[in-house]
Amino acid sequence: LILLWLVLGWSLSYHKGQHGSAVDWIGYSITLADGYVTASIKSEFMDAFTELVRSTLRENVITIDALRSLAGKANHISTLIYAWRPFMDQLWAALARKRPDNAPEGKVWIKSIASALEWFLVFLLLEPGMLIRRWRLDHYKDPGIKAAIHLDASPFGLGAVLIIRDVIVAWFAIPLSYDDLAIHKHRWGDCAGQQTWEALVLLIAVKLWCPQWKEMKTSITIKSDNMAALSLAAKLKSKISSLIAKELALVMARASFQPRFIQHVPGAMNFSADALSRLWDPDGGYDIPAALHSHLRVEVPRRDRSYYATLQPMSCWGAGSSSGP
């Protein structure tokens, strides 16, 4: 490739070339050691960006130039953290706004980008200092561990099964709680909340089982009979529940690998998870499938407001609230 460039007459910046087990590349430090490739962004950059987000949230407006600079820094991080990308959309939209919103000339209301900035701040304060992601080299020599998560939800409960290398390793079944109903504003037994519960069971499963693949190459198949939940897993964006989408992105942002495969499974084929989600159906007729042994059942934390990092008051993170016009 280099010879081709030379033949074409392109000049090369040899002084920028690097070789070895540790190199710096467009703002990242990349090292190879002990069978791992580690990519990191220096703590000085991350600390400065954290303070920039804090100070921006204390203001009412931001200039276009300042917002463009902030978005550029956030985009630099999003290159390493895939789950940041959905939140970048809000910044790009503010920069490209075409309709008047009564903001002062050359400025943008902070309230129009506040939800993205607040999410960034939660992530940054949960993972302070140098941002690091690691990948094991030997995981690139084979397709990786194959894992599947079967999910289902009903207006009465939630169920999921984790399968690794074709072996069931964990499962859970839980009724919808008072906290679930209060936070997501649906009634128990009301089918109007079905898509919300499908998204919630995805979040719970990913939070529980993310450590299984956090730093490993894993072919993860998320199987559900609900297309909206699958779309959420694929894009980390949802019109159903912005809260669940933000929480899911926060979990995914802390993993080196994302689920690679999303699969729709007809309800009749999603038998185990379907049965688990309907254990509390007042019409009855559902039992725990025989293949799901009791010792593999895992406890699910209580899902009150403390379960959701993005529901914590911004005062807890040391950021002031912005106000609009």
Regions from the PLM with identified roles:
Residues 78-80, 91, 159-162, 206, ...:
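A short acidic (Asp/Glu
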